[in-house]
């Protein structure tokens, strides 16, 4: 729809005249306008209908005055210039009957300023409705003409839409919520990345600062205790055992002080170098494994002289921490690296950075502490004749309930708790001593038995069988949770020609083993054969070994008599993680 043409100067004068009369009536509510000339003469009288129409016109004017605002001092401008409200009132008064909008003598109801004002407001409403239908260019022209007319000098008109606002209510154009959300989304995403990057740098700063404090703590040991003992000498009872107390802590201190701390400080300028730093020094970090392996021996010596000789040295050096508190720092530090790296990886990934090498660094720093923990447990093992380092890697360790045959080949009715260490070439059974690690002291272990695997193939067979037994126990757990699904799967297995007897993965086999296990099933169970029996050939773990003694009523059906390796074990452990 085409917007209406711009008003001519003559029309502007008429509009100003209407508004001037309206404002004059508002300024003096009780005052009437100039008396109009009666065409019938001074002696004429009006009819009753004319009086009624005049009364109705007066009521309509009073209704308009009721909601019309009080006049303010503002200027009204047209194409000819601007004038104040008082000037407009005077102009309307002077115009009188000569104005084009004055009452007509023959009209029973003079149009008056109210009627003209209503017409003008209706026309304004019509132009405002055009705004939603016209295109953007035409809408802007109509809006500029009706709402924001300007003078030739560039000055803006005051708000001419005051009365329209009173009739229609205020209309505020707000930006759609969807457009506002879309405009803010990229900004919020960038702010989140920036915040995540700042947090990653905070973690990196914490890593460097704690590394500096860690080097200072190691310096108290090397440059304090060790230097003083080398200068003043050690007691006769401690001579030759002082190296056991400190282990290789001097090597750790010098490497961190001269190399690792400086390289970490360089990472503050280039954070991408942090991952490569830990990956590069993976082999160097294994000196912590050596330190942790010696740590139990160090604790034993320190317990003998800690309250006497080393306490005197602490007071002499003026240290706040005791020597035992300083010697635990390397163990705590190697555990702390993985925590800080995980936090740095989390925020660095949120910042949109490349984290492939950083993930490898986290894996490295998770493996090294595990090795340290294993070596500390092995360092507490006593009574084993041989070198533990010659038994290959430690594959795992856990606590089991072990049942050994008594005299006459009968199984004991009560299992014994044993700590089992699985190496590549041997399985070691030990008994735990001490309070189980409560109160800050780690338990020691006394050697009880072992199972030697002389062939790597035998070792792999053991590992395979252990994995199968763990899988069977998962199946047993699934059978308890979903018996119908388990029976359906077993029936399909039997239909394929496999033996339907209780096997490794059947609940019947587990029930058979449980006849000889104690009531407490929180720990796994192992069955050890009499000591001294020489095996002829290694057998899988799921083969029942029989002795030459008569079978008890609780024994399973007889199988071909074979010999098994000493300590042939049967695991009946439900994986605690699965529970």
UniProtKB/Swiss-Prot annotation:
Primary localisation category: cytoplasm
Spans annotated as Disordered: 27-61, 172-194, 487-516, 546-579
Pfam families to which the protein is assigned, alphabetical: RhoGEF, SOS1_NGEF_PH
Stretches the record annotates as Sufficient to bind activated GNAQ: 472-498
Keyword Protein biosynthesis appears in the UniProt entry: no
GO biological process, alphabetically ordered: axon guidance
GO MF term (any one): guanyl-nucleotide exchange factor activity
Entry's localization field: Cytoplasm, Myofibril, Sarcomere; Cell membrane
Occurrences of domain DH (ranges): 199-375
Entry annotated with the keyword Membrane: yes
Region (Important for binding to Rho GTPases): 317-338
PH domain segment(s): 380-499
Cross-referenced InterPro entries: DBL_dom_sf, DH_dom, PH-like_dom_sf, RhoGEF_Guanine_NuclExch_SF, SOS1_NGEF_PH
Keyword terms: Cell membrane, Cytoplasm, Guanine-nucleotide releasing factor, Membrane
Oligomer status and interactors: Interacts with activated GNAQ and GNA11. Interacts with RHOA, CDC42 and RAC1. Interacts (via the DH domain) with POPDC1 (via the C-terminus cytoplasmic tail).
PANTHER family on file: PLECKSTRIN HOMOLOGY DOMAIN-CONTAINING FAMILY G MEMBER 4B-RELATED (PTHR22826:SF117), RHO GUANINE EXCHANGE FACTOR-RELATED (PTHR22826)
General function of this protein: May play a role in actin cytoskeleton reorganization in different tissues since its activation induces formation of actin stress fibers. It works as a guanine nucleotide exchange factor for Rho family of small GTPases. Links specifically G alpha q/11-coupled receptors to RHOA activation. May be an important regulator of processes involved in axon and dendrite formation. In neurons seems to be an exchange factor primarily for RAC1. Involved in skeletal myogenesis.
Protein name per its UniProtKB record: Rho guanine nucleotide exchange factor 25
Organism encoding this protein: Rattus norvegicus (Rat)
């Amino acid at each position: 729809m085409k917007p209406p043409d711009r008003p001519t100067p003559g029309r502007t004068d008429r509009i100003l005249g209407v508004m001037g009369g309206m404002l004059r009536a508002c300024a003096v509510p009780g005052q009437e306008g100039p008396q109009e000339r009666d065409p019938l003469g001074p002696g004429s009288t009006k009819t009753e209908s004319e009086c009624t129409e005049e009364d109705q016109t007066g009521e309509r004017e009073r209704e308009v005055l009721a909601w019309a605002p009080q006049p303010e001092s503002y200027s009204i401008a047209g194409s000819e210039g601007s004038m104040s409200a008082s000037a407009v009132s005077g102009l309307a008064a002077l115009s009188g009957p000569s104005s084009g909008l004055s009452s007509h003598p023959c009209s029973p109801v003079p149009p008056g300023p109210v009627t003209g004002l209503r017409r003008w407001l209706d026309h304004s409403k019509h132009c405002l409705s055009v705004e939603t239908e016209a295109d953007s260019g035409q809408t802007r022209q109509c809006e500029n003409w009706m709402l924001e007319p300007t003078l030739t000098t560039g000055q803006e008109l005051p708000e001419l839409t005051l009365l329209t606002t009173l009739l229609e209510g205020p209309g505020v154009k707000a930006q759609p919520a969807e457009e506002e959300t879309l405009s803010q989304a990229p900004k919020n995403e960038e702010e989140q990345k920036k915040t995540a990057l700042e947090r990653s740098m905070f973690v990196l700063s914490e890593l460097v600062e704690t590394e500096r404090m860690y080097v200072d703590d190691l310096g108290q040991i090397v440059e304090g205790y060790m230097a003083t003992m080398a200068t003043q000498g050690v007691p006769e009872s401690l001579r030759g055992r002082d190296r056991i107390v400190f282990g290789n802590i001097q090597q750790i201190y010098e490497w961190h002080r001269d190399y690792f701390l400086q390289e970490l400080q360089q990472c503050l300028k280039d954070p991408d170098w942090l991952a490569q730093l830990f990956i590069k020094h993976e082999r160097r970090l294994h000196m912590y494994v050596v330190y942790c392996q010696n740590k139990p021996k160090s604790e034993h010596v320190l317990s003998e002289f800690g309250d006497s000789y080393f306490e005197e040295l602490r007071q002499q050096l003026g240290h706040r921490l005791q020597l035992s508190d300083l010697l635990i720092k390397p163990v705590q530090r190697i555990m702390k690296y993985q925590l800080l790296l995980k936090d740095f990886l989390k925020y660095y990934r949120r910042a949109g950075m490349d984290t492939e090498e950083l993930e490898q660094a986290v894996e490295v720093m998770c493996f090294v502490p595990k090795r340290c923990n294993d070596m500390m447990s092995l360092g507490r093992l006593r009574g084993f004749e041989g070198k533990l380092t010659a038994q290959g890697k430690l594959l795992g360790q856990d606590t089991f309930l072990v049942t050994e045959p008594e005299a006459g080949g009968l199984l004991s009715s009560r299992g014994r708790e044993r700590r089992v260490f699985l190496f590549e070439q041997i399985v070691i059974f030990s008994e735990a001593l001490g309070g189980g690690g409560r109160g800050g002291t780690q338990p020691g272990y006394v050697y009880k038995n072992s199972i030697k695997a002389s062939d790597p193939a035998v070792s792999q067979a053991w590992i395979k069988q252990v994995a199968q037994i763990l899988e069977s126990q998962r199946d047993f757990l699934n059978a308890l949770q979903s018996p119908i699904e388990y029976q359906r799967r077993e029936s399909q297995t039997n239909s394929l020609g496999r033996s339907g007897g209780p096997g490794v993965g059947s609940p019947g086999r587990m029930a058979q083993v449980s006849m000889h296990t104690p009531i407490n099933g929180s720990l796994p169970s192992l069955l050890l054969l009499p000591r001294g029996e020489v095996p002829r050939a290694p057998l899988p773990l799921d083969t029942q070994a029989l002795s030459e003694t008569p079978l008890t009523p609780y024994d399973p059906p007889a199988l071909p008599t074979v010999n098994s390796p000493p300590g042939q074990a049967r695991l009946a452990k439900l994986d605690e993680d699965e529970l």
